[in-house]
């Protein structure tokens, strides 16, 4: 029962931090210091990634009308726009797939530690503040997906590669990259959500294959619980973020990242 409660809490953390540009990994590292689940290291490594499937389903549910191209009710142009969007999403996914698949274990081995997480939290926090100050009086050059060209898409994909380093935040890196090349905040955030679908499905499948699908009944219940909670919380987190950025910029998230990065450093220096 206690492990189930811990899984629920981790699902809440995942559902919030996966979509806000504040690094789910950074929060997981901190949370796991206080919530130590009585399960194997191999299962927990897989759990951290596969729990994201629940979060991803929230995007699919919320944006189904934009993502599903086979509705009989949609006009031809709408279907063409949907196919075009998917081609752009897949193109932006290529850089992360080419680097992430062969080097996944090596990246975790080298960078999954509190020092890396703290540095990336702070650095990207500063970059968000600088970017928003720079763009304060600028009108976005890209405010629709039709205006989002393939060069811009590949550049956003290159930023997503940076998110392979723990603490960066996948949504943070892609949103930052998209805004830097001229996207509006809404387009940047929404495209970041769509990019997560192939990337996180792929990462989850990779971890499941490595784990071997060999779950005990307890492990399966814990994994499904975490995924369901992550799905429910993600619905609210995504709606919150899209509503928030219509009226505000990303600077608050930048300051939050800096504060969290300092907390990570101070905490681990104190206990290690």
UniProtKB/Swiss-Prot annotation:
**Highest classification ranks of the organism:** Bacteria, Bacillati, Bacillota, Clostridia, Eubacteriales
- Family annotation (NCBIfam families): PRK00281.1-2, PRK00281.1-4, PRK00281.1-5, undec_PP_bacA
Q: What is the source species?
A: Acetivibrio thermocellus (strain ATCC 27405 / DSM 1237 / JCM 9322 / NBRC 103400 / NCIMB 10682 / NRRL B-4536 / VPI 7372)
Key word Transmembrane helix present in the record?
A: yes
Chain ranges passing through the membrane = 2-22, 50-70, 83-103, 110-130, 148-168, 195-215, 220-240, 250-270
Summarizing the function annotation, the protein's role is: Catalyzes the dephosphorylation of undecaprenyl diphosphate (UPP). Confers resistance to bacitracin.
Q: Which gene encodes it?
A: uppP
Task: List the protein's name.
Answer: Undecaprenyl-diphosphatase
The record's misc note reads: Bacitracin is thought to be involved in the inhibition of peptidoglycan synthesis by sequestering undecaprenyl diphosphate, thereby reducing the pool of lipid carrier available.
Chief location category? membrane
